[in-house]
């Protein structure tokens, strides 16, 4: 009996080790499946929920096209707030969380963000031939761009997009822009340029 238990003991131990290793590998693979781009919308403007749900696959298609990579994953969230104060509070929370790469929100909220340095210099990713309305900080640095008459905003179900602006959050490692930040800049450039030239 003891001999048989001793014989099977190693089989049991090996089986446990294999199961544990499999779980570790599975968790590492699934955890690496984080998004390549995270967008958040915060506004008091009218938002059509169904249109907004459709934004994720469409942004992913744009990501894949821009990066020439079919494995790209996008994450999109929206918060429809009741007042300008609620929009500002939510936007500050989203920025502090570090979860998002690009932000679309009401103009008034962007104007009241005290630390403008949390946003990338918008002149880096704005098409040079575009005529847009911008928000500038005290140093004359552009940090948010208007989406007025923007076809993508309308496509996403944001009907009243006159007062909406877009900005890219600063994300760096060792002084260099992260891949996610570069993606956010590229996609934001496309969105800004989508009045009639690029329609998803």
Q: Positions of the model-derived regions?
A:
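Cytosolic juxtamembrane amphipathic/interface segments immediately preceding
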Residues: 1-3
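Extracytoplasmic/periplasmic solute-binding protein
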Residues: 31-32, 164
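A structural signal for short loop-to-beta-strand junctions that line the ligand-binding cleft
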Residues: 92, 123-176
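Extracellular/periplasmic juxtamembrane helices and adjacent flexible linkers that interface
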Residues: 15, 172-200
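Hydrophobic membrane-insertion alpha-helices, especially the h-region
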Residues: 7-29
